[in-house]
Swiss-Prot record:
Domain annotation SprT-like: ranges: 20-163
UniProt-recorded name of the protein: Protein SprT
Organism from which the protein derives: Salmonella arizonae (strain ATCC BAA-731 / CDC346-86 / RSK2980)
Cited NCBIfam families: PRK04860.1 (NF003421)
Organism superkingdom: Bacteria
Keywords (A to Z) from UniProt: Cytoplasm, Metal-binding, Zinc
Catalytic residue positions: E79
Chief place of localization: cytoplasm
Length: 165
């Protein structure tokens, strides 16, 4: 799938939210953390990722275009919080108590670990598998691990190994 061109107005809205959240955090934490690099290269079903060492936030342009307001309100502060926790506390659990505190007490945003965006447009091909009780769809990555003998996946309901087909 070709990455969509993001309108400049959306990029500006993302940057505005990032700068507002960063200024708020710097004020509350009495720090001067720098602005992270912002890129629109995230792919797949992840809305965004925070890269600690490069101090960079990668956002999914497809999910952003499809969910502009919710994406800017939730994903931008979520990823910024990861970077701020790393700067403020060092390496901690990705969604641990420090991250939750940063989201809720510092940025004033509900601390949700996952987004609820519709994923139909970014979902890759899946492969049919089954167990004794139901059908399953495995991603390409999981399917390839099964084929190579690197993994066995089990049904969360009946506990039986999943079988292709």
């Amino acid at each position: 799938m070709k990455t969509p061109r993001l309108p400049i107005a959306i990029q500006q809205a993302v940057m505005r939210r990032l700068r507002e959240n960063l200024a708020q955090a710097n004020l509350k934490l009495n720090r001067h953390y720098p602005e992270p690099k912002l890129v629109y290269t995230q792919r797949g079903t992840s809305a965004g990722t925070a890269w600690l060492e490069s101090y960079e936030i990668r956002l999914n342009p497809v999910l952003l275009m499809e969910n502009v307001d919710a994406f800017i309100a939730e994903v931008v502060p979520h990823e910024l919080a990861h970077l701020l926790v790393w700067k403020h506390f060092g390496r901690k659990a990705p969604h641990g108590k420090e991250w939750k505190w940063m989201m809720e007490s510092v940025l004033g945003v509900p601390a949700r670990r996952t987004h609820q965006f519709e994923l139909q447009s970014v979902r890759r091909n899946t492969f049919p598998y089954h167990c004794q009780c139901q059908q399953h769809q495995l991603t390409v990555r999981r399917h390839n691990r099964v084929v190579r003998g690197e993994a066995v996946y089990r049904c969360v309901h009946c506990g039986e190994p999943l079988v292709a087909g």
